[in-house]
Design a protein with these regions (language model features):
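A short acidic (Asp/Glu
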Residues: 191-195
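Sequence termini and other peripheral, non-core segments
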Residues: 1-16, 20, 253
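A polyanion-binding, active-site-adjacent surface
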Residues: 6, 28-190, 201-202, 207-212, ...
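Generic N-terminal amphipathic, Lys/Arg-enriched alpha-helix
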Residues: 13-34
Length: 256
């Protein structure tokens, strides 16, 4: 079903309905992290603000803020892609950074990601914007903030999500012996030092690559433009140099 033919913004299944959401689907390694956060002072403050916003009628995306943690197990993470916050348009955000469901037109940031993927590795541009296949093959698709209000980019940047997303990326550094982190934009790059230092304390290899956010507003901007950054090829080459037989899973693409 096309995005134009369905009122995603009003659909009860494509917006956050309650807080906290069910945690049963979280994969091993993640549930304790999320539960500890929700029980903390920071987590309780975030919960209170989200609950109040929903009670006042705010439209909040995505419907499953923790979806990335239901598709990529902690011990299987090979790459972390870290963005800023979910898409803020109706029917776009689905709980995986930059991903949209099949049938939804890829937003400009995702189109730039596909262009860079093609330029870097020669892979065909996919027919839709779903990155679920990546998530199931060790790519943790995470934003620094896990919720956003309809039509208001960055609206939940100060809600308190960073305490949890900091812990998530540090947990990856603690558990993964070799992981690449692709940090796109200033919000993501603020976590670089914590990622590297945590990995070093545990004797693990961490490779951090930084570039501007793939949004058209910044993708070509100096000094670290996203377009031409080569992150996909560089990440794959580094992992293979660590002895890992890993390459970017090819997404659904048109027949050659």
């Amino acid at each position: 079903m096309s995005q134009q033919g369905f009122d995603w913004g009003l659909s009860a299944t494509h917006r956050l309905q309650q807080w906290p959401p069910a945690l049963e689907g979280l994969l091993p390694g993640w549930r304790e992290t999320v539960e500890d956060f929700l029980a903390s002072d920071a987590g309780q403050a975030l919960s209170a603000r989200l609950t109040q916003a929903l009670a006042q009628g705010a439209v909040v995306y995505p419907p499953e803020p923790f979806r990335a943690l239901t598709l990529t197990a902690l011990d299987e993470v090979r790459v972390v892609i870290l963005g800023q916050d979910p898409y803020h348009g109706p029917g776009q955000a689905e709980g995986l950074a930059f991903s949209v469901a099949p049938g939804v037109k890829p937003p400009p940031s995702l189109r730039n990601i596909f262009k860079e993927l093609q330029r870097s590795l020669g892979l065909l541009i996919p027919v839709d914007g779903s990155l679920v296949r990546w998530a199931r093959q060790g790519v943790l698709l995470l934003n620094t903030s896990l919720t956003v209000e309809d039509g208001q980019a960055g609206s939940h940047a100060s809600l308190g999500w960073q305490a949890l997303t900091d812990e998530i990326v540090c947990e990856v550094s603690r558990k993964s012996k070799a992981c690449v982190s692709l940090l796109w934009g200033a919000h993501a790059q603020a976590k670089a030092q914590a990622i590297v230092q945590t990995a070093a304390r545990h004797g693990h290899a961490a490779h951090v690559l930084c570039a501007n956010h793939p949004s058209p507003l910044s993708a070509l901007r100096a000094p670290t433009p996203f377009m031409g950054c080569g992150h996909f090829g560089r990440a794959q080459a580094w992992l293979q140099a660590q002895g890992l037989d890993w390459c970017w899973p090819e997404l659904d693409a048109p027949a050659r």
